[in-house]
Amino acid sequence: MARRFLLEFEKPLVELENQIDQIRELARDSEVDVSQQLLQLETLAARRREEIFHALTPAQKIQVARHPQRPSTLDYIQMFCDDWVELHGDRNGTDDQALIGGLARIGEKSVLLIGQQKGRDTKENVARNFGMAKPGGYRKALRLMDHADRFNLPIISFIDTPGAYAGLIAEEQGQGEAIAVNLREMFRLTVPIIATVIGEGGSGGALGIGVADRLLMFEHSVYTVASPEACASILWRDAGKAPEAASALKITGPDLMKLGIVDEVLKEPSGGNNWAPLQAGDTLKNALEKHLSELLALSPDELRNNRYSKFRKMGKYLESQSIESEISV
C-alpha cells in the first residue's frame, strides 16, 4: 500500500500511522488476531484527524487544496462518468493539456465536461503545466462549450488551478483576451452550467471556466482572486506573510457562502478528499445530479437571466458617508 503524503500539520498522526502499518504487517505474516488493536488505533487516528481538520486555518486549507494526492478532474471523471470521450484542440493549432474537455454521461444525462488537470509527479506536472492553462486551453474550452450549447448539453466544469499561465508566450498569444471572451460568452450560453472548485480556484484562471449557474466547492478547496503568496508580496513585499493574506482574502467555503459567491460547500471525508477519494466522488456526483435536475427545469432565458443576476449581485462595499457617520457616533 502506497504511503500517504502527510502535510506538516498532520505530522502528529505519523506515529499512529506507523503503528497501524506495523500491526497490518503482523496480521499478514502471522495468524495472530490483531483486529481489535487495529480497530482501536484506526478509531483513534480518525478522531485525531477529525480534530486537526476541524480547526484548519485558511493557510492550512490551501495546503490541503494543493495536496499532490487530492483527486483531480480525470479522477472524478473515472469515478462517476460513463462513456467519456475526450475532445482535443482549439482549432487554431494548439491542444493545451492543462485544460481538458470532452463528452460523457452522468447517470442517464449526457453532458460536456471541462476542467483543469494537474499531474501526480514532476513529469506529469510539466506535461500539464501544473494545471495552468495557456490561451489555447481557454479557447479550446470555449469551442467545446459552444458545441454543448448547439446540442443542448449541460456543462460541468472542474476548477483546479493556481491561475492561468502568466509566461511571456501566454501574453503574446492573448491570455487576457481569451479569458475575457470566455467570461462574455458563458453569460450567453443557454444550457445549464455547474462549476465545482475541486482544489485550487486561482484568479482569472478559475474564472475562465467558472461563470456558472451554480458554483460548488469542496470543504477544503479555496477560491481566491490571487494566491496568498502573491498577495503578500504585492501588499507587504513579503511572501512570508502569506498566512495573514490567506485570512484576509476570505478564500474558504464558509466565507464565500456568506459573500454570496458559492452556492454549496461539499463536505469532505475526515482528512480531506485524498484520504477517501471514492467517498468524495459520491458526494460530488450526488450534488451535481441534484443541481442539474433543478437547472434543467428552467428555460434558456431563465438560465441566462439568473446567471447574470447572480454575478451582478457579487461584491460588497461601504459608502464613505456611512463610514463617517459610524465614526462620529
Curated annotation (Swiss-Prot):
One of its GO terms (biological process) is fatty acid biosynthetic process. Residues 40-294 form the CoA carboxyltransferase C-terminal domain. InterPro entries: Acetyl_CoA_COase_a_su (IPR001095), ClpP/crotonase-like_dom_sf (IPR029045), COA_CT_C (IPR011763). Its main location: cytoplasm. GO terms for molecular function: acetyl-CoA carboxylase activity; ATP binding; carboxyl- or carbamoyltransferase activity. One of its GO terms (cellular component) is acetyl-CoA carboxylase complex. It is found in: Cytoplasm. It holds the Pfam family ACCA. Pathway: Lipid metabolism; malonyl-CoA biosynthesis; malonyl-CoA from acetyl-CoA: step 1/1. It catalyses: N(6)-carboxybiotinyl-L-lysyl-[protein] + acetyl-CoA = N(6)-biotinyl-L-lysyl-[protein] + malonyl-CoA. PROSITE patterns: COA_CT_CTER. NCBIfam families: accA, AccA_sub, PRK05724.1. Belongs to the AccA family. Component of the acetyl coenzyme A carboxylase (ACC) complex. First, biotin carboxylase catalyzes the carboxylation of biotin on its carrier protein (BCCP) and then the CO(2) group is transferred by the carboxyltransferase to acetyl-CoA to form malonyl-CoA. Acetyl-CoA carboxylase is a heterohexamer composed of biotin carboxyl carrier protein (AccB), biotin carboxylase (AccC) and two subunits each of ACCase subunit alpha (AccA) and ACCase subunit beta (AccD). This is Acetyl-coenzyme A carboxylase carboxyl transferase subunit alpha. It comes from Prochlorococcus marinus (strain NATL1A).
